[in-house]
Amino acid sequence: MPVDRRIERQLRKLEKRAAQTSRKPPLSVERIVQTALDIVAAEGFEALTMRRVAATLDTGPASLYAHVVNKADLDELLIGYLCSRIVLPEPDPETWREQIFDLAAQIRDQYLRYPGISQAALGVVPSNPEALRLSEGMLGILLAGGVPAQTAAWAIDALSLYVNAYCLEIGLWVRQMDTDGGWVVTHDTLMGRFEALSEDDFPLTKRYAAELTAGEGHDRFDFAMRTMINGLGGH
């Protein structure tokens, strides 16, 4: 009978839905963190919300709060997870500068995989165990290099701030390219603007336009980091 067939179809749908539900992996902090990172990698940090994570996991926002306190807690977990990927060397008094530089480059590369995520690093106190592991490692390297304790402590903060700001700037460029359909100010365009300036008003900018616009890849990052690190040796 038609009614029976309809009932059978509904039963099959319910059975299929129950089977799919039973096969769905249980919610965990690890799944939440990985889902959040996937969202940031694909759409940027600003797209990350608790509701978005819940929707991607096919659950309700309330379910997340059994594992994550709030968005700030999620941000701290994300930074902690990225810090866990950083390889710490054994402090070496002979190569401490290169060791610190390498750690900064590792952090940079992790953050750049997830556009805008350095905002989370700027907004949290480093209390996550993995973030503290990284801070402990950096402190050990600086102390091994003969940097005074107070200078080393503040240097960690200064170096971290630069890495975060650098990655945030790169993320903003990427976002601008996506928003404006790929349009950005190219090196040649910027050179042209500087060269077109009035020599009476901007004689130095016009004269040193090539130097002001020089650099490829992470050249400027390398320069800034090495300048700061080398300066620590004078203390």
Where are these regions (language model features)?
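A structured, mid-to-C-terminal "fold-capping" secondary-structure block
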Residues: 2, 181-235
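Amphipathic alpha-helical interaction segments
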Residues: 31, 73, 102, 133, ...
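Short, basic, alpha-helical segments at the C-terminal edge of helix-turn-helix-like DNA-binding modules
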Residues: 81-85
